[in-house]
Amino acid sequence: MKIEMICTGEEVLSGQIVDTNAAWAANALMDHGIEMQQRITVGDRLDDLVEVFRQRSEHADVILVNGGLGPTSDDMSSEAMAIAKGEPLVECTLWRERIQEWFTRNGRHMPESNLKQAMLPASAIMVDNPVGTACGFRVKLNRAWLFFTPGVPFEFKKMVTEQFIPFVEQIADSHIEVEVQKLLTIGQGESALADKLEGMPLPDGMTLGYRSFMPYIEIKLFARGEAAIGELDRVKAEVLTRLGDAVVGHNVASLAQVIHNGLLASGKRLSIAESCTGGMIANNLVAFAGSSNYLDQGLVTYSNESKVRVLGVKPATLDDHGAVSIATVEEMAKGARGLLDSDYALATSGIAGPDGGSEAKPVGTVAIALATRQGVYSQMLKFPARSRELVRQLSTAVALDMLRRELQESPVLVDYSSYPRFAR
């Protein structure tokens, strides 16, 4: 089965917004054993939309169309589909009532323009959008089913998950059982990981892939069919053996998720004192509901004065070693932990750039410490200085990994081949 995606919108085509919907959809489909063969982006021009609907419907079996279902003049997907099919737009009474109910329920007057969202090609089959006013629908043209979804990300994701993927699985010629295992890694480049996995035999029906999304590289094992699935645990164990300390999570999207789960399970509490990461560590954790059960505080102690007055860092430590030093982050971590008697505290201080570096401590130099009730672990690393954001992301990842290792009773300090460690 050949599956494609058509993304619509002038702002997407011109690069004014990043098309996160397309990337998310391709990954979600892959997790279900569904591979997308092609993706096309088209602006808000009626003739171009009509042409691409007609053209791609002769080559694909299923086309996921995203965007252009709103109430404004530049939302043209329904009209373009009707023209491509050679049929009129007709009002979907059920959806008109749904829109009216939505506005009434939210205590708002419905603008006349919203009625446009109930106008569908005559042969369209309505696809429910339970969280918005844009009506989804599907239409058969030539060999393809075109499946229309709104551009609003949370509406799109819900419809793809609950409507589109089940539809594709239903019309597929045969359903092959699929299982995916994902291993999250940090600290090694994609080529280094590939070298370690080079020559590892894979059984028929199993593939291995890489996905880089800073600060992580995800290793994905994809098994199709009962025989390949039966070998998945064995192959995964071999990958873990070959990659060793690089693997920091299993079937999770981030290290923060690992820490969240680990702290909830342990009943331990955490404080954070951040300088160069500027609240990024805390932000990663509070994204998860329930983080209040373990997060005592997140402090951004950016200035030397705040390090001294809030965390109790000794002025002499700053004078002798500087703000970016193992001595300073150790005192930051101890001070943060002591404020509320937390079980753990993380601290960061570094040079995120683009300025501020020196020969001894170039841009990308970051000191990180983890304080526990038993003592303090610390290290100073040199991260790639390609951007300020990257330095902060990598610093956050290593800090969280140090805590992960402590929670899992593993050695807290390990070598990351991509991030050289300064001598103490």
UniProtKB/Swiss-Prot annotation:
InterPro entries: CinA, CinA-like_C, CinA_C, Competence-induced_CinA, MoaB/Mog-like_dom_sf, MoaB/Mog_dom
Family, per entry: Belongs to the CinA family.
Protein name: CinA-like protein
Organism whose genome encodes this protein: Shewanella loihica (strain ATCC BAA-1088 / PV-4)
Source organism phylogeny: Bacteria, Pseudomonadati, Pseudomonadota, Gammaproteobacteria, Alteromonadales
